[in-house]
Amino acid sequence: MTGRGQPPKKNDTYDYPRKQPPKNGSYDNYDYPTSTKTRSTNKQRKDSNYPPRETIFEPDLAADPIYSVPRPPSRVPHKLVKVNYKSNLVPITASNSVSELLSLHDETQVTECVEAPLIAKSPDITVYEKMFSVRPKHTLTKLEGKQKMFTRKKKGSFVKIGSNMLEFGESLKSKLHNDSKKSPDEPDGLVHVPVHLLYPPKHQDPVPAFFIFLEGSIGVGKTTLLKSMNGILGGKNVLAFHEPIAYWTDVFSNSLEEVYKLTLPAKVGRTSNSAKLLACQLKFASPLLALKTATDRLSSPKNSLLSSDMWVMFDRHPLSATVVFPYMHFQNGFLSFSHLIQLWSSFKASRGDNIILLNLNSQENLKRVKKRNRKEEKSVSIEHIRLLNNCYHAVYCAWLLVQNFTPEEIVEVCFNAKHITDLSSSKPSFLAKHVSTEDMLKSSIFNTWIEMTKAHRDSCTLMECLLTFCKELEKVQLIHVNVSPFTDDIPGLWASIYTSIRRNSAIKPNRVNWLALEDLARTFNSQ
């Protein structure tokens, strides 16, 4: 403890209390005992009539000593009291009477400032920095300023993306809960669920009908032929299942648009790109495989020996989505071989699947693609169409091999357990009379399998995958038809297809539930 009015021990961080003002009442020549941190500002303080910091006097205390309390501006009271002292001070002792004390009180005038300032004088900021150890504000360099500006822009973009995601979530939620639109015939906004397909009507007498799947490059004329079949056959003897464009473009995402973005030249060899392309191809295959399963439930597995003029026609077989187009993406370098095997393993077929492979000149094919003007197909080039036709040809060559040799023999050849020439010599086939089986193997998709699995010939899983694929491919019948002579002659094209079907003894009709198939076709095409 120090005595009243006596400074403590020397400490540079302490602002010593001030002594009593001089008797002349002037602050001009008053020497302020200050610390080393505030000594440099004495010259500025002498120019003022009042101390530069707030001075508070309490009336109940004596005027000696006077303490100066620095406060931040936010805590300074709005009203200050100015005390005027008389210069001739009389010491007070115990012998003073009450009247003398009262006279001394009258001589001390306490007046209220008419317009009290917030503080007596605004102190220099350097004084506060030294007294309270306030760090000066860091001045950003040019590089730091750019980084801060970039962070703000990036934060703003993230906020914008977040708001867009919230809007997308709300729209998706409304779609899932069917709150966005109400159909005019359903006032409650409930979607018509096709539960009637779960309980198909029973047909007393199954009808023999041919299952025809139209396949080929994009824009080759499959949809045009399918739409013309009602006029050619009268409408009562044909059921048409169109391409599920609505499912590919509207359900969850637009896979048609996405697949063309994923097949840009700059995305060759990317693993993440291959995974996305695999997801798109599986989405393409989903409605085709589902429709294939549904029609198989409504048909008899036994082939009918009777002739028939009833036709069930499809725009594409699962062969295109699981085998042909993935093989084209692999040839271009967009799809990895492991993902190609996954798609080939998902290929399914049935006895009685008759695939009509339509082929057209590449130049004419490109003109048809540009003429229909689909926004997803704007980037299609003639090289794309030629490569796609070559992939269909490779699948056709593989089908010819499977038709002339057993699936087990094909697997042995693909795993280098046997040579294709040994098979052709021990078992004369139809191919040996026309083309070389070795050349046919090199032109087929099996040649790619041989090259890509040389290091994994001991894998039983790969062997089973290839065997399953060959057994599924063996079930179908492929007919190659050239469309070029029938550019504007749809009936002539159908006549050529009809003649090829009748000449092929392996193509036979199936017994089907016609009423249930009609209901399925009506529901499938309406979506």
Curated annotation (Swiss-Prot):
- Detail which positions bind ATP: G216, S217, I218, G219, V220, G221, K222, T223, R368
Which Gene3D superfamilies does this chain map to? P-loop containing nucleotide triphosphate hydrolases
Q: Where is the composition biased (Polar residues)?
A: 32-41
The record lists substrate as bound by Y260, Q281, R374
Q: Which SUPFAM superfamilies match?
A: P-loop containing nucleoside triphosphate hydrolases
Family in the record: Belongs to the herpesviridae thymidine kinase family.
Active site residues of this protein = E243 (proton acceptor)
Which EC numbers does the record give? 2.7.1.21
Note the superkingdom of the native organism.
Viruses
> Which reaction(s) does its UniProt entry say it catalyses?
thymidine + ATP = dTMP + ADP + H(+)
Q: Which UniProt keywords apply?
A: ATP-binding, DNA synthesis, Early protein, Kinase, Nucleotide-binding, Transferase
Stretches with biased composition (Basic and acidic residues) = 9-18
Q: What does this protein do?
A: Catalyzes the transfer of the gamma-phospho group of ATP to thymidine to generate dTMP in the salvage pathway of pyrimidine synthesis. The dTMP serves as a substrate for DNA polymerase during viral DNA replication. Allows the virus to be reactivated and to grow in non-proliferative cells lacking a high concentration of phosphorylated nucleic acid precursors.
The name of this protein is Thymidine kinase
Which InterPro entries does its entry note?
Deoxyribonucleoside_kinase, Herpes_TK, Herpes_TK_C, P-loop_NTPase
Assembly: Homodimer.
Q: Which organism is it from?
A: Saimiriine herpesvirus 2 (strain 11) (SaHV-2)
EC main group: transferase
